[in-house]
Structures are given as structure tokens and as C-alpha cells.
């Protein structure tokens, strides 16, 4: 689903700091602008929905513990 892909792109960026073009390559050659848009969509959704924001932040926190 596009929601899952967008969240994944956001999380990869937050955890690794990878360049947008490199994240795009992980997702079958999506362009850097597609990745940027996806990250912006997730940031907007997080700003509008505190429960969603906490869920994403918890995922990131749990992944950083490994």
C-alpha cells in the first residue's frame, strides 16, 4: 500500500539520513521528488494526528534500539 511505502520512506530517512535518491532506489527506482513528497505527506499526517505520530515515533525508537 502507498501508506506503508510512505511511512517506510519516512522511517528510513529518519534513521539513516540516506539521500532521497538512494531511498528511491530502494523502492524500485522512485524519484527523489516522489520520496520527498512521501516524507512530506507523513510529516503532515503526523502533525494532524497525534496517535499516528506516536506510532511512527515508537517504531523509530524500537528500530534504533537494535
PLM region spans:
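Intrinsically disordered, low-complexity basic tails/linkers immediately adjacent to helix-turn-helix/homeobox/MYB/SANT
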Residues: 41-66
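Helix-turn-helix DNA-binding helix
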Residues: 31-35
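Short helix-to-turn junction characteristic of helix-turn-helix DNA-binding domains
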Residues: 12-13
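Residue-level signal for the short linker/turn that defines the boundary of a DNA-recognition helix
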Residues: 4, 16-19, 30
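Pre-recognition alpha-helix immediately N-terminal to the DNA-recognition helix
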Residues: 7-8
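Short alpha-helical "recognition helix" segments of helix-turn-helix
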Residues: 22-25
Amino acid at each position: 500500500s502507498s501508506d506503508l511505502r510512505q511511512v517506510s520512506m519516512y522511517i528510513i530517512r529518519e534513521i539513516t539520513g540516506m539521500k532521497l535518491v538512494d531511498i528511491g532506489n530502494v523502492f524500485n527506482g522512485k524519484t527523489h521528488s516522489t520520496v520527498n513528497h512521501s516524507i512530506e505527506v507523513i510529516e503532515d499526517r503526523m502533525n494532524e494526528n497525534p496517535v499516528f505520530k506516536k506510532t511512527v515515533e515508537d517504531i523509530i525508537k524500537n528500530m534504533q534500539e537494535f
